[in-house]
Amino acid sequence: RDRSVSRGLGDVYKRQGVKHLTLARCPMTDVVKEILEDRQALEELTGEIVCGHAYPNGSYSPEIKTLLPSLGIHYARIATDTGLYTHPQDFYEWNPTCHHNNRLMYHAKEFLSFDLPQFQYLFYVWGHSYEFDRDNNWYVIEEFCKMIGGREDIWYATNAEVCHYLMAVKQVHTSVDEKLLFNGSGQDIYLIRNGENILLHPGELFR
């Protein structure tokens, strides 16, 4: 795929702690308790594995980032808009493109104008559903969905789906002459090679 959108607004399983504490000010024992108790509660509620985190109040530290993988967390979002459409360099310090109140339609139009699939643009919108009632602006997300929805050249994905796919891409191995491709991951991988669209199934060797 040449573009992707992360559904920050619809990703209800990303957790922010039991008490929404400012984690960088807490002892690490409290951080562990906050994350694991909230994970367990959400998993019991949804019947799914919760592997994402959003830093409450945007608060984190290098120590907290180092801790997260051992707690089953694969990625963590910060609330700092970048205005960019790039992949995260660090999944534990994942900055979105924009909040839904921050020039959303401008970013949508800019995103749709891109035509260089090799860059694999990522448009990440974040926000909270309660804000639409508070600000009386449901029309903002409705207009956005009308503009950007229903397109075949966009992959509409959750944070976890983007994270796991990009991790899987790193498990594609090539021969020195690039004639052989092997998908060592457990999911389908989409590639473009010499203008040809290639679908690599899990464990497949492409010749």
Residue ranges and their predicted role:
Residues 1-64, 69-74, 81-98, 121-129:
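Metal-dependent polysaccharide deacetylase catalytic core of the NodB/CE4 family, i.e.
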Residues 7, 65-68, 112-113, 142-146:
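Short amphipathic alpha-helical segments and helix-helix/interface helices
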Residues 28-33, 105, 135-138:
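Non-membrane alpha-helical structural segments and their capping/turn regions in soluble enzymes
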Residues 43-44, 75-86, 109, 124-206:
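C-terminal domain-boundary segment and adjacent tail
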Residues 62, 102, 134-135:
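Loop/helix-junction capping segments adjacent to catalytic residues or to phosphate/diphosphate-binding pockets
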Residues 99-114:
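A Trp-anchored, charged/polar loop motif used as the substrate-binding/catalytic surface
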